[in-house]
Amino acid sequence: MSSSVKTPALEELVPGSEEKPKGRSPLSWGSLFGHRSEKIVFAKSDGGTDENVLTVTITETTVIESDLGVWSSRALLYLTLWFFFSFCTLFLNKYILSLLGGEPSMLGAVQMLSTTVIGCVKTLVPCCLYQHKARLSYPPNFLMTMLFVGLMRFATVVLGLVSLKNVAVSFAETVKSSAPIFTVIMSRMILGEYTGLLVNLSLIPVMGGLALCTATEISFNVLGFSAALSTNIMDCLQNVFSKKLLSGDKYRFSAPELQFYTSAAAVAMLVPARVFFTDVPVIGRSGKSFSYNQDVVLLLLTDGVLFHLQSVTAYALMGKISPVTFSVASTVKHALSIWLSVIVFGNKITSLSAVGTALVTVGVLLYNKARQHQQEALQSLAAATGRAPDDTVEPLLPQDPRQHP
């Protein structure tokens, strides 16, 4: 006899499932990098007519942090390395583009080619961060999907380099830190994701701070500002489609796999594009002549390796902490990049620009905490609804064994 079993009854049989803490206020936002655990949702499954087997399938994949979260030794190591490689890549990009007169498209091509070659080596040689497993089958639209995501990834890199070439590092990083605004818009348009009142209110200081930085920035440039905003839009689109590829039910790609395939697709599209636009002025090109001597080639190769290491450590960190914690860490990285650029490059900023930078940073932090609060509230509501008694469903075991001899 086959029985239909509700989801809450199955959760008690799963080892390691965690109940939400009782007595916690729904408005409590917790610590900045606090531990977050999420329940795995199980679907009911009925056996066949001649079977008494109950099949449990996972219908929703969630990311669960370790008990220490970002404060674990391995996560702290990945966080430190990610910050270090990001800062090195950012400042080396600015040096090559501004002081040496490099082209954003050329530097982006070097970065994509470098991460493709290194990613190919990683798929053949096991390393400490990733053990590649051979894939038996690929989705039918694999090539078109990778070409599309690869195009968005390459456009994100090139547009980011164009913004670095035309505006100060501090201003470019401030504009990039406004990405949550575009995340909300893209999630609503593509995924139909709902955002609550607290999330929408948290965007006000982000937009206000960005307006102050834009109005008072000494090195403001329309091309650089437009490129930075376009980077956010392309990055949000890339993240949405990458999320679908990373969380698919039948064809699920690992993060290093997706990084390699999209980089290879970007390089494949880059070659004909460079040939076709050979005589067309490159976006962001200055009047300086760019000579390729031994030192410049060494700098370009170093930049490509640093770009790949930045991506690898970011993926490794994402595997240890939740996406919300990763987003908060990314916000902290943007804030540190802004002020380190002021120290390293001596960028002049006005008092209003400093206030705008602080407003953007605080607003993005509030946005991430509001998103976390919204997710916890929805999970609490779902758990309360799931625990409600339902007399119409027959229990898995009889409540009184004496009634069923």
Swiss-Prot record:
TM spans (from-to): 81-101, 106-126, 142-162, 167-187, 195-215, 219-241, 264-284, 296-316, 326-346, 347-367
- Which GO cellular component does the record give, naming just one? membrane
Superkingdom, natural source: Eukaryota
What Pfam families does this protein's entry cite? TPT
Task: State the protein's purpose.
Answer: Putative transporter.
Question: Which family is this sequence assigned to?
Answer: Belongs to the TPT transporter family. SLC35E subfamily.
Recorded protein name is Solute carrier family 35 member E2B
Gene name of the record = SLC35E2B
